UniProtKB/Swiss-Prot annotation:
It holds the Pfam family ACPS. Mg(2+) binds at D8, E58. The gene is acpS. Belongs to the P-Pant transferase superfamily. AcpS family. One of its GO terms (biological process) is fatty acid biosynthetic process. The lineage of its organism: Bacteria, Bacillati, Bacillota, Clostridia, Eubacteriales. Its EC number is 2.7.8.7. This is Holo-[acyl-carrier-protein] synthase. Keywords: Cytoplasm, Fatty acid biosynthesis, Fatty acid metabolism, Lipid biosynthesis, Lipid metabolism, Magnesium, Metal-binding, Transferase. GO terms for molecular function: holo-[acyl-carrier-protein] synthase activity; magnesium ion binding. GO terms for cellular component: cytoplasm.
Length: 125
């Protein structure tokens, strides 16, 4: 059974400006060390990769029907399997909320261009 869906689109330039303005403070507040390692491994795709992960975190919140005030950005981590397929790992308060709502599986799709990043999340339970 589908418990929720969420979609988010982010302008890549918006995330790039946030990084320029706030630097490491922004990066550490929003992204996990694993996400940062992957995103910064390619300077050419850095901003688009960060924007896609930002969109994924927003899409997870929308799918669960909650706001950011209840959780931390880093409670949702975008991971990749051996074939590069993205997935979401929940921790902390966000994992507790998802479990309380009966979430058993989270599907994630990401896409980005130089201008925009989009994420779609479907939560099953």
């Amino acid at each position: 059974m589908i418990l929720g869906t969420g979609v988010d689109i982010v302008a890549v330039e918006r995330v790039a400006r946030a990084v320029e303005r706030h630097g490491d403070r922004f990066l550490r507040r929003v992204f996990t060390p694993g996400e940062l390692a992957y995103c910064t491994s390619s300077e050419a795709h850095r901003a688009a990769r960060l924007a896609a992960r930002f969109a994924a975190k927003e899409a997870v919140l929308k799918a669960l029907g909650i706001g950011l005030r209840e959780v931390r950005w880093t409670d949702a981590e975008v991971c990749r399997d051996e074939r590069g397929r993205p997935s979401v790992r929940l921790t902390g308060r966000l994992a507790e909320i998802a479990a309380a709502r009966g979430a058993t599986r989270i599907h994630l799709s990401l896409s980005h261009t130089q201008e925009y990043a989009v994420a779609q999340v479907v939560i099953e339970g």
